[in-house]
Amino acid sequence: MNVSPSIISRWGSQHLVVLLTVLLFCWVCPTEAQTFRIDTISDAVFQRMQGKSYPKGCIVSRSELRYLTVSHYDHQGKTHTGELVCNKRIAADLIDIFRSLYKAHYPIERMRLIDDYEADDERSMRANNTSCFCYRAVSGSKKLSKHAQGLAIDINPLYNPYQKGAKVQPANARRYCNRAASFPYKIEKGDLLYRLFVSHGFSWGGSWRSLKDYQHFEK
């Protein structure tokens, strides 16, 4: 870092120390653009959802949903801007949670609308995609899922699978059913992500008795 003699003569030594400190901080700690927004569902977003996460006959109104954009880190420490559609009732909760996760550099690999995977939950989970709203039934039943209301979110699903007996979803996640093993993106009871969701009134599928859904938080 070069500082000209003219600056030294004009500012004096004390001012120069302040200037150098500020410049050094900006060089070492560049400001990262952060995004934590809640928006109504725009025409462009709604068009992406049509016939996919928002199929014909969906009884959840567009006005009940919100589009979120949030900054997050991946396991390599790279920053990304993710997107979610959720129920407006949990939008502020999710923004608070993801802002805290971002500050802590908690890793989330991918966060795209499930419509980018044709609303195919298996495809989305295989890609380790974090998602929220999708108008669909609970796996193996005709009962509407909390996802159908936008009141549930699946986080890092490849590494935090759904397991009921021999059934595992996504199908390529069987190795991650061993919760005693150590691997990236694993959600554990008591970790930061768990504590944040529980403190905002969510329940965790990893605590269920009849099955385990380690990726799943709902309200």
Label every PLM stretch briefly.
Residues 3-19:
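Bacterial N-terminal signal peptides that target proteins for export
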Residues 17-27:
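Bacterial N-terminal signal peptides
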Residues 34-78:
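N-terminal module-boundary/linker segments of secreted carbohydrate-active enzymes
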Residues 60-125:
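Active-site acidic/histidine clusters and adjacent loop/turn architecture
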Residues 112-147, 160-162:
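Active-site-adjacent loop/helix surface patches within enzyme catalytic domains
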Residues 138-140, 144, 150-219:
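Catalytic cores and adjacent binding grooves of peptidoglycan-active enzymes
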